[in-house]
Structures are given as C-alpha cells and as structure tokens.
Amino acid sequence: EHKKEKRNGAFGTMLAGAGTEDRFQGRASINKFQKQQQSSFLGMGNNVNEQGFSLSDYMNFSGGSQQMMGGGGGTMRIQIDGAQSGVPLNFGGRQNGIMTNYAGGLNFNKDFSPKTQLNTSYFYSYLDQNLLRSIDRINYLPSGSYNFAQNSKQLSNAHNHRANLTLDQKLDSANSFKLTASASYNESNQAYQTSSTTALPDGTLQNEGINTTTNNSSGINFNTNMLLRHRFAKKGRTVSANLTFGINHAESCGTLQSTNQYYTTPGETLDIAQTNSQVNDNQTYGANVSYTEPLGNRKYLEASYNIRT
C-alpha cells in the first residue's frame, strides 16, 4: 500500500517534432499530486492526422492513476468515458484527408475534508480537415463505353468546449448530497464541392456538372443532477431523491448550389439553389424518488417513482 505522503509530487511528459512540408507534432501532460489534491494539464497539436490521447494520458488526467495507487483491499471500477469528459481518445484507425487538430484541458480534484470532495475539468478541442478525391472511370455497356471523371474537395472544421463539475458533500452521518453539472458548446462548418464530366471515348461531352454544399451548425448544452441521500438508523433502510434539469439549444443552416449541363439535349441546363435552416430548443426536467427496505437474509425491497418532462 502506498502511503499518502508518498503520493505527493509531480510528473509529466513532453514530445515535439517537425518535418518536411510544414509537418509538426507536439504533446504534453503534467500531473501534480498533493495531500488530497490532484491537478493535471493535457495538451496536443499536430497536422499528421493523429487524433486523441492515449488511455494512460486520459487516466492520469482524470485521476484514475491516483485511484490505482491508493492501495487497500476490495474491488475498483474505472469507467472510461472520453465523450463525457470532453477528452478525445485515440483507439487507432485510419483517418482520411489532411487534418490539423489541437486539444487541451485542465482537471482539478480535491478532498477538502472527509465530507467534501470536488472534481472539476475543462477541455477544448479543434479539428480542421481537408479532403481531396479524384475518380477516373471507364464504364462499359452493351451499346458502348463512356468515361466518367469527378473531382471533389471537402473542407471542415469543428470547435468543442466542455466543462464538468462534481461536488460530493456529506452533511452528517445520515445525510449527503451529490451535485453534478456539465456544460458544452460546439461549432462546426463544412463545405463540399464536386465537379464531374461524362464523355464518349472520342472526348465528346455528354454532360457535366458542379455541386456545392455548405453546412454550419452550433449547439449549447447544460445538464445538472442533484442526488439527495438519507440513511435511516435501521441498517439498509435508505431513501434518495434524484433531481435533473437540462437545456439544449442547436441551430444549423446550409446551402446547395448545383448546375448540370446535358449535351445530349442541346441547351438543357438544370440549376438548383436551396437553403435550409433549423433551430431546436429543449428543456428537460426529471425527478426520481427511491426507498429501500431491508427484508433480512440479504434481501431488499425497493420502491421508486420517476417523472420526466
């Protein structure tokens, strides 16, 4: 078992590199432990198509490694939820296009007393992706063949902010509450353009077209949860109330511009121009009350009531 005084200190890692064609990569993590307190920084940036952090980086940042060093008997459960914390995780896999991404955040955990525990975190991530595709294809039909060529370009970027807070407070030996709150803001922009031609083997154009679509969206989310707990004098008899509240706002707008020229019918051109926009606002309220009564011989009776709007 590690003694508490041996868990005081700091450690971290740093990595930096540069290459041809303005390629770069950087990563840093700093973790500091004190009595009943942990603070962490995690950051990265690169344009070599590497997204997210490793599992060990995430555990050090969130405090999982400190829990593992705590020693003692019993069992321990570690939940990996990068989406909930806002930390992007890297589980491998191939990424298409040229991507530039930055991510970084702060985490602070502190036990103010045996009755008061606080966990907070903030994380930001940015991703920029450029994707170019070209297709050259010959199609063979019973009536003959034709050549199809297409070039496409996709540009997209996304910003994400997320903050989390958890306060666990024991009021006395029988009563406690746990407050959990999270807020996030995200914004994304996309532009996609394709140009294509269809021609006979001798180069005679049959049709050609160009299509451009754009989409811009943003969203704000806020969720809070208050868990109230009471333990009666009789062992195993408890009552709890869980109150939830959430706000969600999302909006998006997009455009479509398309022009297609058909040469098999001289002078026939098809033009399309469209715009669309959406706004969604939601509020949610919820409450759950649960009562547990011991029946003896490790058996319990639980009654609960739940409401959600």
Model segments located where?
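Solvent-exposed loop segments that connect transmembrane elements
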Residues: S143-S145, S195-E208, T259-D271
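Membrane-proximal, glycine/serine-rich, low-complexity loop/turn segments characteristic
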Residues: E1-Q193, N211-C253, Y285, S290-R308
